[in-house]
């Protein structure tokens, strides 16, 4: 058997639409550039991705959760530097009207040429702010300007004192959040890799100055282990240190994943020093120092940040999990089984119920079994086409187990359970099925 892994992102885009992972937003109107909707399977899987990250963070004894507002006081973004500095250099081609970023387009950097048509008839570089601006209230004037947040992190900083005092946590401790952010990207693309509306999963870990470098190392290791735990292959991951640091950073490293278009950033891990809290102290006039009671001293905490895009991680899980198993029979005919080898905690459905026939005696048992399993798991029910085609459908969407109800079930009250990856089958009593599936999910890859 030959194994082929994903080489072309278009293969995944097609599968995502066909199976209900991701749809083009507003498709009946021709779509809206780089905006995507998560379908029946995608919404389930995305929830699982967020739950995996959330549990990894907030089930620790030193991290609390936060759900901050998307709209914030505009001075937040002045203090953070976004109003004055959150921009990309933009260039227009006067021939083909293409717009592109000047700082990451090779043909422009090397030869001052348009990446689309090759023309050198280009505009001067100009700064383009990436924040979406809107107005709050009935009047559209300068006093009503607000922004759709470009990151969730600032909610952590302005709520640092609230969270610390309400939870009574002592430093070191963290604040975790999942939420929508918006950036008016010049060149979005590569499916859901870079979009203008996206969901972030960020954690800010507040530490005493002088301990920051050690915690930075620890969080690098923890985040790497998170990806390995949920099934991403080590050879598809690497760390990349930043050559040039952002204005707020003392140190920065990216976790990169090998997407079909090459290694690209999956998560950023940053030592933000005391920049953010210091800035908000300066602009708000509020004292955000932390008082260390045992040592009787005050300081502005340093911050270790971990920031990953949920949509980008969703894409990485699909890219990493996709495989084609190619077998050849004696006549030389090839057969291809497409498998989405997702970790069970990430897969949209944990189990599928497949009655061998649509006859009433099997359907009634199967529907009761579906309801029994649904008390503990996300369950798919499928009774159309041959059992072989139904197995293939479940393989393609990543369902770890298929439960087949056959005519023997009527007498022995047992079902056949099929393992997605091993394709082994086992007969299990209906009364033991929930416990069996739960146990097997925990040891699925062993």
Swiss-Prot record:
- The residues the record assigns to binding ATP are 183-185, 193-198, 265-266, 309-312
Which BP terms in the Gene Ontology apply to this protein?
A: glycyl-tRNA aminoacylation
Output the superkingdom of the source species: Bacteria
Q: Which InterPro entries match?
A: aa-tRNA-synt_IIb, aa-tRNA-synth_II, aa-tRNA-synth_II/BPL/LPL, Anticodon-bd, Anticodon-bd_dom_sf, Gly-tRNA_synthase/POLG2, Gly_tRNA_ligase_bac, GlyRS-like_core
Q: What is its EC number?
A: 6.1.1.14
CDD domains cross-referenced by the UniProt entry? GlyRS-like_core, GlyRS_anticodon
State any single GO MF term: ATP binding
Q: Which GO terms describe its cellular component?
A: cytoplasm
Quaternary structure and partners:
Homodimer.
Question: Would you identify the family this protein belongs to, as annotated?
Answer: Belongs to the class-II aminoacyl-tRNA synthetase family.
Name of the protein this chain belongs to: Glycine--tRNA ligase
């Amino acid at each position: 058997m030959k194994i082929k892994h994903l080489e072309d992102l278009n293969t995944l885009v097609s599968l995502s639409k066909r199976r209900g992972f991701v749809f083009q937003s507003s498709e009946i109107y021709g779509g809206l550039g780089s905006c995507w909707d998560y379908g029946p399977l995608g919404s389930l899987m995305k929830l699982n991705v967020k739950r995996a990250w959330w549990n990894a963070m907030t089930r620790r004894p030193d991290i609390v959760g936060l759900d901050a507002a998307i709209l914030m006081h505009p001075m937040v973004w002045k203090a953070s530097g976004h109003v004055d500095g959150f921009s990309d250099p933009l260039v227009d081609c006067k021939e083909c009207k293409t717009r592109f970023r000047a700082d990451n387009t090779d043909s422009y950097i090397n030869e001052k040429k348009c990446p689309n048509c090759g023309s050198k008839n280009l505009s001067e570089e100009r700064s383009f702010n990436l924040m979406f601006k809107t107005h709050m209230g009935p009047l559209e004037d300068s006093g009503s300007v607000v922004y759709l947040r470009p990151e969730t992190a600032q909610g952590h900083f302005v709520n640092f004192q609230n969270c610390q005092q309400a939870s009574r946590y002592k430093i070191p401790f963290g604040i975790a959040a999942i939420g929508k952010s918006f950036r008016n990207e010049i060149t979005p693309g590569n499916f859901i890799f870079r979009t203008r509306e996206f969901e972030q999963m960020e954690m800010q870990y507040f530490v005493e100055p002088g301990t920051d470098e050690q915690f930075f190392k620890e969080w690098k290791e923890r985040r790497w282990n998170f990806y390995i735990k949920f099934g991403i292959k080590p050879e598809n991951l690497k760390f990349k240190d930043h050559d040039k640091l952002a204005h707020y950073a003392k140190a920065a490293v990216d976790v990169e994943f090998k997407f079909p278009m090459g290694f690209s950033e999956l998560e950023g891990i940053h030592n933000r020093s005391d920049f953010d809290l210091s800035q908000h102290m300066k602009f708000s006039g509020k004292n955000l120092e932390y008082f260390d009671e045992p040592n009787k001293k005050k300081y502005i905490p340093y911050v270790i940040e971990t920031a990953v895009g949920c949509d980008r991680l969703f894409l990485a899980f699909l890219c990493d999990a996709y495989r084609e198993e190619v077998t050849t029979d004696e006549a030389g005919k090839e057969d291809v089984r497409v498998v989405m080898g997702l970790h069970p905690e990430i897969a949209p459905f944990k189990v599928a119920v497949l009655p061998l026939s649509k006859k009433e005696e099997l359907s009634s048992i199967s529907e009761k079994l579906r309801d029994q399993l649904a008390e503990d798991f996300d369950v798919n029910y499928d009774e159309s086409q041959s059992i072989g085609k139904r197995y293939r459908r479940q393989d393609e969407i990543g369902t770890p187990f298929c439960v087949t109800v056959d005519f023997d079930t009527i007498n022995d009250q047992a079902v056949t359970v099929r393992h997605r990856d091993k394709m082994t089958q086992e007969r299990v009593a209906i009364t033991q099925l929930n416990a069996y599936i739960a146990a097997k999910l925990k040891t699925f890859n062993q």
